[in-house]
Amino acid sequence: MKQSITLRSAGPFLLLTFIYFIVGFLTTVNGQCQGPLKIAFLSEVTTTKNSLATLISFAFFLGYLLNSAKTGRLLNKVGYKKTLIRSMLVMVLGLAFYLASALIAEYWGGAGVHISQDFVPFGYFIFLFGSYLMGTSAAMLQVVINPYIAAYPLPGTQPVQRMNFTCAVNSFGTTIAPFFVTGVMFAGVSLDSVSADQLTIPFLVMMLIIAFTTWSTSKANLPDIEGTREETQDVESEVKTTPSDDSGNAKKRSIWSFRHLKYGVITIFFYVGTEVGIGNNMNLHAMDLMGH
């Protein structure tokens, strides 16, 4: 008998899809804030203005590099739901640092450090750390969501269909985020008039929304899926293959023994570098052409 999709069966899938939308949305918001923050935080910087602005994206994606593998181990240890909630809490903390950076720049804008001939306010460094936390959260959430969506037994669907739908929603978030930055966060404001106080309310609202989503997730029924994570604690970066020894025990091989995985890692490294480099620095180039 063919099972039909119900709200109960689709609930975890829809919840994770919505969180994946948030990941795409905030990833692009972070990158598109480089231009306005270049004026709000770095107006007194001359020689290294673009370099410091680009560090915002560098800090964000540094979170992926340093914390993805750790999240995999955490997932094996505590399961999907607890890892998901911790990931969301990191996102709330990152937005709190964003908010703090705006408040410090607004009320203590004269506090900062001199780097060479340039003055860099403390608010910039706080935003930079918040960007790292946001990247860490995005990496953690992807480690949780991707395998869960692929393995979740939603009636009448295939893994590739579920992944395509979830990724499409994620891409929709990245598509509308620039309009949010220009049409909401800095609506009706010229580049010359951009200031840190315009960041306060948007970041506060986003932080409250993510905090509510985290609370809702903690109350939701998010079942663990058997056979999708390593239960033992002494195995790292290994997969089981078919038995081939005399005793019939399964042999273990490193995941790096798979050639196509190595090629995929190299490919996605260059792809993401190109995607982020062009997308996040195009606005900086446009601002330079306009004399900002």
How would you label these PLM feature ranges?
Residues 89-120:
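C-terminal ends and interior cores of transmembrane alpha-helices
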Residues 177, 181-189, 202-234, 238:
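C-terminal membrane-cytosol helix-exit motif in multi-pass small-molecule transporters
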Residues 30-34, 253-292:
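Extracytoplasmic gate region of multi-pass secondary transporters
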Residues 11-41, 142-146, 278-286:
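Extracytoplasmic
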Residues 161-186:
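Glycine-rich segments within core transmembrane alpha-helices of 12-TM secondary carriers
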Residues 1-23, 115-118, 123, 252-257:
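Cytosolic juxtamembrane N-terminal segment immediately preceding the first transmembrane helix
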Residues 54-75:
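Central cavity-lining transmembrane alpha-helices of secondary-active solute carriers
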